[in-house]
Swiss-Prot record:
The gene is argB. Keywords: Amino-acid biosynthesis, Arginine biosynthesis, ATP-binding, Cytoplasm, Kinase, Nucleotide-binding, Transferase. Belongs to the acetylglutamate kinase family. ArgB subfamily. It comes from the Archaea. The lineage of its organism: Archaea, Methanobacteriati, Methanobacteriota, Methanomada group, Methanobacteria. This is Acetylglutamate kinase. Signal peptide: none annotated. Catalyzes the ATP-dependent phosphorylation of N-acetyl-L-glutamate. Its EC number is 2.7.2.8.
């Protein structure tokens, strides 16, 4: 395609999303190296300069696990959620708020954006409560057993005020998935859930989840079976029939919930592909899976 045609193809999208909030979730698995993070930060700045209002939520699961291993702690997950004791919570804060958040903020600023780093504690952005213990049933004895996840939270409410104030003043908010409870305790939150809930809370037009797979696949072992567009109802059927499973399940449920809460479209795309964000937003074909009502 001629370079100029790329710009012409982008125009309807630039018009449609002018001044609209776009929630972008930078997944820990998508941020494979500094170059990938830098490229995504630059694309985020481009979105801002063509008139959209990007808001970033980042993860960092793999990096937290690496830090835990270095400190001699073994990471443990139950249904995708990290079991978080006091010491793990300190590591989570250090990695997410101290390292990843500041790194994304400085990369966005380097490319000319005005990024501000926040966690869910700032201005009570993410009020959370400790999750109830996970109940498992022993297959043999049928006995019920409770497993406490520790300092893991579920979101009670999102206060969009601080985010709106920042986007209204041309800043790009960058949010760490850490919540606060009513007694000021820190809680570890799943970053996908945070992205979905904040997207709904701020009335975002789009939720874009950057991860390490091409999107939702009909056959998870075959990248050629990518589903490019799907409605929430069709997707809910795929979930019920067990076609969407494993690591894709929480992301898929987050997208379904976001659409049901009023976000116009949700996208799952491969963040390892350079400029996947721009290809998804500005081209007709897109690059990943787009979910709509
Ligand atoms: C996550 C927070 C980071 C995250 C964790 O501790 O790994 C819980 O599991 P990704 O890269 O998006 O997976 N929190 C409760 O979600 O990062």
């Amino acid at each position: 395609m001629k370079t100029v045609n790329i710009l012409v193809e982008a125009l309807p999208y630039i018009k449609k999303f002018h001044r609209k909030k776009i929630m972008i979730k930078y997944g820990g698995h998508a941020m494979i190296d500094e170059a990938a993070m830098d490229s995504t930060a630059r694309d985020t700045v481009l979105l801002k300069y063509v008139g959209m209002e990007p808001v970033v939520v980042h993860g960092g699961g793999p990096e937290i696990s690496r830090a835990m291993n270095k400190m001699g702690k073994e990471p443990k997950f139950i249904e995708g959620l990290r079991v978080t004791d006091e010491e793990t919570m300190e590591i989570v804060k250090m990695v997410l708020v101290g390292k990843i958040n500041t790194s994304i903020v400085s990369k966005i600023c380097y490319h000319g954006g005005r990024a501000i780093g926040l966690s869910g504690k700032d201005s009570n952005l993410l009020l959370a409560r400790k999750r109830a213990p996970h109940v498992v049933r022993d297959d043999e004895t049928g006995e019920r057993r409770e497993i406490d996840l520790g300092l893991v939270g579920e979101i009670e409410s999102v206060d969009p005020g601080i985010i709106n104030m920042l986007t209204d003043n041309n800043y790009i908010p960058v949010i760490s998935p850490i919540g606060v409870d009513r007694d000021a305790n820190t809680l570890n939150l799943n970053a996908d859930t945070v992205a979905g809930e904040v997207a709904a809370g701020i009335g975002a037009e789009k939720l874009i989840v950057l991860t390490d797979v091409p999107g939702i696949l009909e056959d998870p072992s075959d990248p050629d079976t990518l589903i490019r567009r799907i409605s929430v109802d069709e997707l809910s059927d795929l979930v019920k029939s067990g076609i969407v499973e494993g690591g894709m399940l929480p992301k898929t449920l987050t997208c379904i919930q976001a659409i049901n809460d009023g976000v116009s479209s949700a996208h799952i795309i491969d963040g390892r592909v350079e400029h996947s964000l721009l290809l998804e937003i500005f081209t007709k074909k897109g690059i990943g899976t787009m979910i709509t009502e």
